[in-house]
Amino acid sequence: MREETPEQPAPLRSGYTTGSCATATSLAAARLLLGGTISDAVQIVLPKGQQVLMRLEFCRAWENGAEAGTLKDAGDDPDVTHGALVFARVRLSAEPGVRFHAGPGVGTVTRPGLTLAVGEPAINPVPRQMIERHLAQLAAERGYAGGFEVAIGVEGGAELALKTMNPRLGILGGLSILGTSGIVRPFSCSAYIASIHQGIDVARANGVRHIAACTGNASEDAMRRRYALPEIALIEMGDFAGAVLKHLRRAPVEKLSLCGGFGKISKLAGGHLDLHSRHSSIDLPQLAGWAAALGASTALQDSMRAANTSQQALAQAHAEGVALGDAVCAHALRFARGIVPTEVALEVFAIDRQGNLVGQACEERR
């Protein structure tokens, strides 16, 4: 039998970012090179001052340097890198400072628009700062005046990266080493939202003036059929419509097309920025009210309120010639317009489960 769910569920467990893993392994390897001993754990300080002890899978001599590895623990967050082996390979160099390299499974930046220059390893700024700070402190403690060559790798990272937005962002060959706080908050989805922002920034930096933000593969396909947009212009927003709309305040484009399943667009029309079922639900009475404004009969309104799904309510409305899909898109456009700068032309499209267009609303610009 299935076990009953406890009335008071246990609190979700936080984890550590790939940036924290890279810092811990870099420090352990560098310490070994500067006369330290092989250890099975290392303590690091996170950006906000928390001290954490991270377990090592190995710490050993490697070629003319040293390497250390740790398993990424994302806590209870559904992170693609959870359980992956993150490792650092460190060599000493005569020149002071730290020079970063992409080890196996870590990507390289190939397009402008990110916080890293083209050609740089995809080790983000905060993880770089963490590693630099820890290695500088170690060098001072050991009286070492030279520098470090640091290569960060992730076992299986090239394959894992295909499940992320890295290929579309132009980060090729592997994963990015991420993190701003050093801690992964369960279901905070901060990495996903950051990748949405990066996608917009990369599109802008590469001269793209029209982007299409889509909730999934079917809506992306619909936008491909409608427009000859390059892949870089397709932004996989998932449930995070707010991440797109708010980012355009500081990083506007000429035109934004929003496309998603009818249910998702219905939530946006109802004033929700997070379209996931955990945070928003479809308001069937609201849909019935919009249908009423289009002349829907009382019987139709009642059947829509009793519908099992938004798709069923849509089918009922369309069967009576009520253009509910267009109305929902118009309400979604009106809500989005209140967030997005007026310089950005807006349009909204809704599709059914087969990917067919069932509604649209486009602004007329003079």
Curated annotation (Swiss-Prot):
> Which keywords appear in this protein's UniProt record, sorted alphabetically?
Cobalamin biosynthesis, Methyltransferase, S-adenosyl-L-methionine, Transferase
* Catalyzed reactions per annotation: Co-precorrin-5B + S-adenosyl-L-methionine = Co-precorrin-6A + S-adenosyl-L-homocysteine
Q: Which residues form the signal peptide?
A: none
Q: Which GO terms describe its molecular function?
A: cobalt-precorrin-5B C1-methyltransferase activity
Q: So, what pathway does this thing act in?
A: Cofactor biosynthesis; adenosylcobalamin biosynthesis; cob(II)yrinate a,c-diamide from sirohydrochlorin (anaerobic route): step 6/10
- Please name the Gene3D superfamilies in this protein's record: CbiD-like (3.30.2110.10)
Q: Which Pfam families match?
A: CbiD (PF01888)
Q: Name one GO biological process term.
A: methylation
Which EC numbers does the record give? Answer: 2.1.1.195
Q: Which PANTHER family match?
A: COBALT-PRECORRIN-5B C(1)-METHYLTRANSFERASE
| Similarity remark | Belongs to the CbiD family.
HAMAP family of this UniProt entry?
CbiD
Q: What is this protein called?
A: Cobalt-precorrin-5B C(1)-methyltransferase
Q: Which gene encodes it?
A: cbiD
